[in-house]
Each structure stands twice: as structure tokens, then as C-alpha cells.
Amino acid sequence: MANQRMLGFVHTAQRMPDKRPAAERRQDFAEIYARFSDERANEQANRCSQCGVPFCQVHCPVSNNIPDWLKLTSEGRLEEAYEVSQATNNFPEICGRICPQDRLCEGNCVIEQSTHGAVTIGSVEKYINDTAWDQGWVKPRTPSRELGLSVGVIGAGPAGLAAAEELRAKGYEVHVYDRYDRMGGLLVYGIPGFKLEKSVVERRVKLLADAGVIYHPNFEVGRDASLPELRRKHVAVLVATGVYKARDIKAPGSGLGNIVAALDYLTTSNKVSLGDTVEAYENGSLNAAGKHVVVLGGGDTAMDCVRTAIRQGATSVKCLYRRDRKNMPGSQREVAHAEEEGVEFIWQAAPEGFTGDTVVTGVRAVRIHLGVADATGRQTPQVIEGSEFTVQADLVIKALGFEPEDLPNAFDEPELKVTRWGTLLVDHRTKMTNMDGVFAAGDIVRGASLVVWAIRDGRDAAEGIHAYAKAKAEAPVAVAAE
């Protein structure tokens, strides 16, 4: 009875992979979860009830065929499970590690709603695809024929790389341009190693190179070439730069030293982990060692910052967030990990200013009451009069979200249209901007979001580019000449 299909959840409890003790994982940047054993993966995959309406798949941005690869895993058919997994996702082993499954597939699992505990979808996904790499099943997707057309991709993050792989598989010569010296974007420089070890990204980047994708690192559009120049070189150009401009806080003392942006802090930490020498880390300005650290914000980036500060040897780490725990945008799992590792959360508190002469010594804050819900359904923060207090701080990290850069100006293309939020305006069916042959995908279109949404957008953009290139090739010569 225990092995009966679709009833495994009745007899088998939810079990996550083994997690390293908090005291141990505070000491390094290695991933905190072990991989499932074969037996554990089979057991946990067998908990899937094979629902008639798979809400896990419905709530997956790339529409992964989750019940199918869970069933195949439970039957020991791992190579088939891998084939199903990679059919809808360019980076499944990455999503298995960093997706907030508690907000997506697992949070909407029918078994979770029935109080039996969700199927551990993300951990099984990681197991399937890590096994595929170990067994040599992962191969470059080379085209059956070359089309003789080239596409330029600006940005080597998840949206850009997903599109690059799809386009290369269709037969395009794909050139990826990125401002950094390594490909991967925020997968390399924004997400800490304890969530995503960089070797996992590096092997994917190499796989695309083996398929024929051509990389141009240290290439900045607007400096090394303008967007008009790239348009003349390629049949189509995809803008997938992400959003890197940090939201700031305007408060007394915000210009003091040692008040830094989250991405600057995380990028420095990741570069050091990769073996680079970074002056800002060496001189202590972007190094939490021995400091009282306060992180402002409640999203996943804030969680990355507090957990990084712990590993760098901070004396204390506090997270200041204006709403309560249940209303924070970050993953609840990440909050739990942070608490285990020694982070203190100060809920319903907002910064009002900073103390110090030349460098910050404290954060002046006020207590917050959550009032009536706004149009989005979230309760509106309201300041409690007379509730001021100060938190000691030698380093303040602002993790308040990201905004788009001024791309029309940066790319020397003033005709490129943006929305009122500064994101690129696209036709959401084709992903094309207002400029012929210029497409956009990922955060630069939807705003700061999840890696898995960037993958979906990149895949969709590749289809839009392919349809555009085909139509252009089939058009009458006179029209094409115009």
C-alpha cells in the first residue's frame, strides 16, 4: 500500500534534503542543502498525487511538466525525467536551487493545501538535473542546419542566455554582449554561492559556448557600440539587460559613508568568492567583517545580504522591514534560514534617517502600524507617533529594489520607447519594441522579478525573433529593400 501510485503522500511524510547545521554553514559560501539520495528522491517523487488539474504546473512561469517528471523519477526513469524537465526550462538545475517554490509550484501543490505537506518539487528537480550532468546526458543543442542569420543579445543573464540557447538551436549565429567579464549576469554576481554555487552557472555558460553561442564580455553598449550599430550588424537585437539601478532612500544622513547599495555589496562578495581582488572589499567599505550590519528591505535580495554578512563575520546582523513577516515579499524559507544563522529581524519598522559625522553609526527608525489594505490588498504602513528608536550600525545595506537604467540615453537610441516606470515598452505577443527588429525580455520589460520569469521571457522572445526573421526573409525584395 505504501508504494501505491498517487497515494504515497498518505504514508510518506514530506522530507527535504539534508541541511547543513547553521553553525557550519555560517563559515562558508557553499550550498546549504545536500542532494537527494536515489532512494529519497524516488520516495519523495512518489508523493505526487498526479492531480487532474496540476496547480504546480499552472503556477510555474515556464509551465514545467512537473507531474510527468515526478512520476518518471518515482519509477527510476531518470533520463526520461531529465528530457521532460529540460524541454520547458533552459536552466532547470538552477531553478531547482533558487526558485521560491514556496510561492510558486510547492505553495500551490494540492497536497500542501490538504495539509500533508507539498511534494518537494524543487529538490527533485535539482536531483534530476544534477544527475543528468553527472551521467553525461546534458548535451549542447546544436542546430541541424545553419540559417546564415545572426542575432545580437545584449545581456548575459537568464533571459539573454535562455533566448541565446533557443535561437542557436534554431540555426542562428548568436552573439551575446555583456558588460561584465563573466557571463551569467545576476546568476553570477547577484546571487550568493550558498544558494547557487558558481560552478553550476559556469557549466551552463560553457554548454552554450559548445553549441556555438559567441560571447563578448566587457562589452558595454553605448561605449563599445551603439544600438544602431548593432542593429546594422544583426537581423535582430534582443535587449535583456535586467534592471540594475538601485532604489534609494531620501532621509537625513543618507549620504554618510558605509551606506551602500545591495547589488554593489553582493557583487563584491561574489567576485571575492570567485577569486578576484576587489579594493572595496580589502579596504572594508564593502566588507561586513567585525561590523554591526543593518539591511533595509524585505525581499530576496535583502535575505541574500543578511546571510552574506553573517558569513563575512559581522558582529551583528539586523534586517529592518516596514511590514510584518507574513506580508514580506521574500521567501519564507529564506527568512527561516537567516534566523537559523543568527540574523535578527525588526518587523514593522522603517528608517527615518541615519546618525554619524562622516560614516554611519546608526539607523534612526520608527515603529509601523499596518492599516487598511490598499488597492493591491496589502495593508498600508502607518507611522506610530513617538515610537522613534535607533539601531547601531557600522554598515547599512539598502535592499529596496531595483529600477531600469536610462537605456535610450545609454544605448544612444533616443527613439527607443519606455513605459512610465522606465521599462522598455514591447508588444507582449512578439516581445518587439517600437523599433523594427529590436526585442526585449526579462526584468527590463517586467521590472525586477524572478529568474524563472526571465527564462520564460527569453524563450518567448526567441520565438518572436524567429517569426520576425522568417517573415523578413520571405518578404518581397522591394519591401525588404525599404
From Swiss-Prot:
Sorted UniProt keywords: 4Fe-4S, Amino-acid biosynthesis, Glutamate biosynthesis, Iron, Iron-sulfur, Metal-binding, NADP, Oxidoreductase
Class of this enzyme: oxidoreductase
Signal peptide feature range: none
Domain 4Fe-4S ferredoxin-type: 39-72
Molecular functions (GO terms): 4 iron, 4 sulfur cluster binding; glutamate synthase (NADPH) activity; metal ion binding
Catalytic activity from the UniProt record: 2 L-glutamate + NADP(+) = L-glutamine + 2-oxoglutarate + NADPH + H(+)
Coiled-coil intervals, chain numbering: none
Cofactor(s) recorded in Swiss-Prot or TrEMBL: [4Fe-4S] cluster
EC number: 1.4.1.13
GO biological process: L-glutamate biosynthetic process
Residues involved in [4Fe-4S] cluster binding: 95, 99, 105, 109
Cofactor note: Binds 1 [4Fe-4S] cluster.
Pfam family, one: Pyr_redox_2
Pathway annotation from the record: Amino-acid biosynthesis; L-glutamate biosynthesis via GLT pathway; L-glutamate from 2-oxoglutarate and L-glutamine (NADP(+) route): step 1/1; Energy metabolism; nitrogen metabolism
Assembly notes: Aggregate of 4 catalytic active heterodimers, consisting of a large and a small subunit.
Something else known: Glutamine binds to the large subunit and transfers the amido group to 2-oxo-glutamate that apparently binds to the small subunit.
PANTHER family: GLUTAMATE SYNTHASE [NADPH] SMALL CHAIN, GLUTAMATE SYNTHASE [NADPH] SMALL CHAIN-RELATED
Protein name (record): Glutamate synthase [NADPH] small chain
